[in-house]
Swiss-Prot record:
Binds to multiple calmodulin (CaM) in the presence of Ca(2+) and CaM-like proteins. GO terms for molecular function: calmodulin binding. Gene3D superfamilies: 1.20.5.190. One of its GO terms (biological process) is trichome branching. It comes from Arabidopsis thaliana (Mouse-ear cress). Residues 332-345 have a biased composition (Low complexity). The keyword Membrane applies. This is Protein IQ-DOMAIN 19. 'Furca' means two-pronged fork in Latin.
Length: 446
């Protein structure tokens, strides 16, 4: 049943007093008893509606007891004590009370919001614990914030810095391209140089091998020709002709020596002297000793080697006797040196002393030649002239092939010219002829 206005005011006053004393909202639970005993169930809720405090109380039970307790106020203390004990009990044992059937004039909890739960505490109760800290935020929003910050920083970068960074990157790429290009060109150049050098080296090696082969073949041919010349002298017709001419020349020289000896033996029978004086036997002997010594000097190793070089190198090569190839012939300078070393320089001192002694003897024995018959001397001179004229044709051929013979004739004729003899004309003819042959021989040498 709904209370009237005076009852509402009384209830309001009671609620205000309770709030002032304990500052809590009293919640009185009901106890249902069986049979006829019932208690009063009071549910109170404090709500702020239109700026004022509205206290609603629904009283169920017997009205008589309620009015008595309300008017008399005897049992207020006992009720307060019961309420405090029940509040402590409920606070110590938290739990959800079982829902029971009760009479209520308010809206159900399903339709309306639940009433606020007010904690009933005592004055001596400890303060409530502090609230727990809030949970940490998730990582995903943090990452998003970092990305957002970077984007903001990039946006804040000036346009000049972006252009500079792009230019540096382009330059780096272009320089790397140029470096690769230069490296490829250098590799190609090195390969080309290696190919060219290898070709040149191979070409030079082949040229040297060909030259060596040509030299070896030339040396072999030269050796074969030398062996043939050494072993085939007897079969060569020209060498046989030269040998016969040399033998004839030596035989003629021996005959001339014999004629001179016969004239010397017949000079004892000449009564009167003549203008054409002859040589003494000592002069002749000294003259022929000089010739023999000259021959021995020519047969010495040095002179023989030079004669051999001259004979083999010049005469035989000029008359188709190639002991040496054409490229090994003597030059003009070497021939001039050989010509400068002529026979008078090569004459040994002993021969020169013998010639001087022979001249002195001839000068001392010149008066003795006056006793030689004039006819014999003339005959000998005429015989010498005839023999010389007969020999010219043969000696010409000999001097063409053997110019060294002119040197011997020249020396022998000079010694005869210096001696006192009657055949001066023959001596002069022989010397002139020897000089003429010597000049021809030297011309043939060149």
């Amino acid at each position: 049943m709904v209370l009237g206005c005076p009852k509402r005011e009384a209830v309001k006053e009671f609620g205000v007093q309770c709030l002032k004393q304990e500052n809590v909202c009293p919640i009185i639970t009901s106890r249902n008893q069986t049979h006829t005993h019932t208690h009063i169930t009071i549910s109170s809720s404090l709500t702020l509606h239109n700026g004022g405090l509205s206290l609603q109380k629904i009283i169920m039970g017997k009205t008589s007891k309620w009015f008595r307790s309300l008017l008399t106020g005897k049992k207020e203390r006992t009720k307060e004590h019961i309420i405090q004990s029940e509040c402590v009990f409920t606070s110590s044992i938290p739990g959800t009370p079982k829902e029971k059937r009760r009479w209520s004039f308010r809206r159900s909890s399903a339709t309306g919001p639940p009433p606020p739960a007010c904690a009933i505490t005592l004055k001596d109760s400890p303060p409530p614990p502090p609230p727990p800290p809030p949970p940490p935020p998730l990582q995903q929003p943090f990452v998003v914030e970092i990305v957002d910050n970077e984007d903001e920083q990039i946006k804040n970068v000036s346009a000049e810095e972006i252009e500079e960074f792009a230019a540096i990157k382009i330059q780096a790429c272009y320089r790397s391209h140029l470096a690769r290009k230069a490296l490829r060109a250098l590799k190609g150049l090195v390969k080309l140089q290696a190919l060219v050098r290898g070709h040149l080296v191979r070409k030079q090696a082949t040229a040297t091998l060909r030259c060596m082969q040509a030299l070896i073949t030339l040396q072999a041919k030269a050796r074969e020709q030398r062996i043939r010349m050494i072993g085939g002298d007897s079969t060569n017709p020209r060498t046989s002709i030269h040998k016969t001419r040399i033998n004839n020349f030596y035989h003629e020289n021996e005959e001339n020596i014999k004629i001179v000896e016969m004239d010397i033996q017949s000079k004892m029978y000449s009564p009167a002297p003549s203008a054409l004086t002859e040589m003494s036997p000592r002069a002749y002997s000294s003259h022929f000793e000089d010739c023999n010594s000259f021959n021995t000097a020519q047969s010495s190793p040095q002179c023989f080697s030079r004669f051999k070089e001259y004979y083999n190198g010049d005469t035989l090569s000029s008359y188709d006797y190639p002991l040496f190839p054409n490229y090994m012939a003597n030059t003009q300078s070497s021939k001039a040196k050989a010509r400068s070393q002529s026979a008078p320089k090569q004459r040994p001192p002993e021969i020169y002393e013998k010639q001087m002694s022979g001249r002195r003897r001839s000068s001392m024995e010149a008066p003795r030649n006056n006793g030689v018959p004039r006819a014999v001397r003339m005959q000998r001179s005429s015989s010498q002239l005839g023999s010389n004229t007969a020999k010219e044709s043969q000696q010409h051929h000999h001097h063409q092939y053997y110019p060294w013979m002119a040197i011997k004739l020249d020396r022998s004729n000079i010694s005869l010219m210096e001696s006192e003899c009657g055949s001066t004309s023959t001596v002069m003819t022989n010397t002139n002829y020897g000089r003429h042959v010597d000049v021809q021989g030297n011309n043939n040498m060149y």
